A protein has these predicted regions:
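Membrane-integrated ABC transporters
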Residues: 1-55, 71-84, 99-103, 107, ...
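An intracellular "coupling" helix at the cytosolic face of ABC transporter transmembrane type-1 domains
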Residues: 32, 37-40, 127-128, 144-153, ...
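Transmembrane helices of ABC transporter permease
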Residues: 37, 41-54, 84-88, 92, ...
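Hydrophobic alpha-helical segments in the permease module
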Residues: 84-96, 189-193, 197, 262-278, ...
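ABC ATPase nucleotide-binding domain helical subdomain, centered on the C-loop/LSGGQ "ABC signature"
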Residues: 116, 334, 411-413, 447-488, ...
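ABC-family ATPase nucleotide-binding domain "signature/switch" substructure
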Residues: 396, 438, 449, 468-469, ...
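Helix-to-loop junction immediately C-terminal to a conserved catalytic motif
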Residues: 402
Length: 577
């Protein structure tokens, strides 16, 4: 290979290694912001760890002198040394108990803090940015990676400081008795440091791949369970099972590759440790043979050499944990650093509102415009109906109204009675009572589902809302009425019943704009007609927007819009009855 090309490749590798290290450090800088929230407890944890190490060393020195007494070298201080040995053991046990308690409290508090923060960030994330992640991937990061972040924030700094103190204390204790033995015991350190630095990039690549494969498998499992009815009805159980096994095999292969890599690295570290151990033992036996040290001192040397090696192994073990936690922190950071929703700063006017879109063009990220220069309006007491084929832009228009998708051009506003305009954003979402396609009920009682719209709703208010949605007849016939429990997605109810409860929940919310996205699709024509009549009667000052494929709703509309190829045409405008 030409010298110039080889130098270019080396520079490229060094640059990649530097970038990887910079990213890891940035992830840890973000993670340690959580450590600052519990800095007093972490300081206590560190202090207890240092004191526990000191007590352990004190006990080792006491043991050295006890051995010398037994072997006849020193008999004058037997009572004191027995007391010191017993006392150090008792104190060590007490420290272990306190440290365990402090650590558990720290872990719980920080894990809860991290999970709560990530949960809130996800809820406030921009809708389009969030949809770059599958639900399974988000769940995997939320369940697995947040725990690693919390654990790292709790234990990383204390482990570094306590391990560093332990290394220094043991080294200087050995140095007091024999500087040569101390240097021999320290001999494995360069191997540990050099080897750990050399494998940094490869460890990070393995960790990244394992997390990605784990997220893919969780996403596949979540999607399968969510669509279990479809899987069963299509008879694709064996196909799904086969796909899961393929993903498991990919994860297994990667895990075994990483394991083999770790085995080789650990074997090299063990060889270096064994060489140091035999060298130290040989030198110690030589000193004992020449009567330069006592048998108790040799025991102390071997014990502390083992302790020093253990401390180095702990330090070496921190490096894979450092990388693994950094990967988790990076994955959580990706969720926390998603762009936030746009929040308006103007308070909504009281009373009825009119919604208006003027020459709006909207598109999804990295895609063509779905809405092209459309205009739309719906005022108090009106029912504006959107019709059109699938993919024509109806759902996108609904998302614009809800502040989930932002216009690239044009204006989307709410107008109050006094003529003031407010730009639609996440902040204006409270002006809408929204009933989306499909079942949107949660597990719990019917009353709990209704009170999601209004927490302090009375029995009378819930009954009135259910009557408006033509749901009171079947709800009142249930054994426990509104206190009847239902499963997730409305399990235990028919699709039409679930839709009517969702409409009742929207009515109970009392927002000035009611937005129904195919929300009557599961109702028969007679029930659909009655629901629309009830809405006009019960909500005279509410603007109602309805997307539908069915002709039955058209006779109740005051504005009819047809969506086609991204355009929106107002077909007819009738005055409210």
């Amino acid at each position: 290979m030409p010298e110039k090309k080889r130098c270019q490749m080396e520079r490229k590798e060094n640059k990649a290694r530097f970038c990887a290290l910079s990213e890891v450090l940035a992830d840890w800088k973000w993670l340690l912001t959580y450590s600052r929230r519990c800095k007093k407890m972490i300081a206590l944890y560190i202090a207890l760890g240092v004191l526990g190490t000191t007590v352990g060393l004190f006990g080792s020195v006491a043991g050295k002198y006890l051995i010398d007494i037994v072997t006849g070298y020193d008999t004058a201080r037997l009572p004191l040394l027995v007391f010191a040995a017993i006392g150090s053991t008792a104190v060590s046990i007490a420290f272990d108990c306190v440290v365990s308690r402090v650590l558990k409290k720290l872990e719980i508090d920080l894990n809860n803090n991290v999970r709560a923060d990530v949960f809130d960030r996800i809820l406030d994330a921009d809708w389009q940015a969030l949809h770059a992640f599958s639900c399974g991937d988000i769940l995997n990061r939320f369940e697995t990676d947040t725990g690693a972040v919390g654990g790292g924030a709790v234990s990383w700094l204390p482990q570094i400081l306590v391990t560093a103190y332990r290394l220094c204390a043991v080294f200087f204790l050995i140095w007091i008795y024999s500087p040569v033995m101390a240097l021999i015991a320290l001999g494995g350190a360069p191997v540990v440091l050099l080897l750990s630095a050399a494998v940094l990039k490869k460890r990070r690549a393995f960790e990244n791949k394992l997390r990605r494969l784990g997220s893919e498998m969780t996403a596949f499992e979540a999607e399968t369970f969510y669509t279990i009815d479809t899987v069963k009805s299509l008879g694709t159980m064996q196909s799904q099972s086969r796909k899961l096994k393929e993903k498991q095999e990919a994860l297994r292969a990667c895990s075994l590759q990483y394991n083999m890599f770790s085995v080789r690295v650990n074997a090299l570290l063990r060889v270096a440790g064994a060489f140091t151990q035999f060298t130290a033992m040989g030198y110690g036996l030589y000193l004992l043979w020449t009567r330069a040290i006592t048998f108790g001192t040799l025991t102390l040397f071997l014990q502390q050499r083992s302790s020093l090696t253990s401390a180095f192994e702990s330090a070496a073990g921190l490096i894979p944990k450092f990388l693994s936690t950094a990967i988790s922190a990076h994955r959580v950071r990706e969720l926390c650093e998603l762009p936030k929703e746009r929040h308006g700063k103007t308070a909504l006017p009281q009373g009825a509102l009119m919604v208006e879109l003027k020459n709006v063009t909207a598109a999804y990220r990295n895609g063509e415009a779905v809405l092209k220069n459309v205009s739309f309006a719906a005022g108090p007491g009106e029912i504006a109906v959107l019709v059109g084929t699938s993919g024509a832009g109806k759902t996108t228009l609904v998302r614009v109204l809800l502040g989930l998708v932002y216009p690239e051009s044009g204006r989307a506003v709410l107008r109050g009675k006094n003529g003031c305009e407010i730009v639609i954003s996440a902040e204006t979402r409270c002006a809408f009572s929204y009933v989306p396609q499909g079942s949107t009920l949660f597990s719990g009682t019917i009353a709990e589902n209704l009170r999601m719209a209004k927490e302090n709703a009375t029995e009378e208010e819930m009954t009135a809302a259910l009557k408006t949605a033509c749901a009171w007849a079947f709800v009142s016939s249930l054994p426990n009425g509104v206190n009847t429990k239902i499963a997730e997605h409305g399990g235990g109810l028919s699709e039409g019943q679930a839709q009517r409860i969702a409409i009742a929940r929207a009515v109970l919310r009392g927002a000035p704009i009611l937005l129904l996205d195919e929300a009557t699709s599961a109702l028969d024509e007679k029930t659909e007609a009655q629901v629309l009549k009830n809405l006009l009667t019960a909500l005279p000052d509410t603007a109602c927007i309805l997307t539908t494929h069915r002709p039955g709703a058209l006779k109740y509309c005051t504005r009819l819009y047809k969506a086609e190829n991204g355009a929106l045409t107002c077909i007819e405008v009738n005055k409210p009855a």
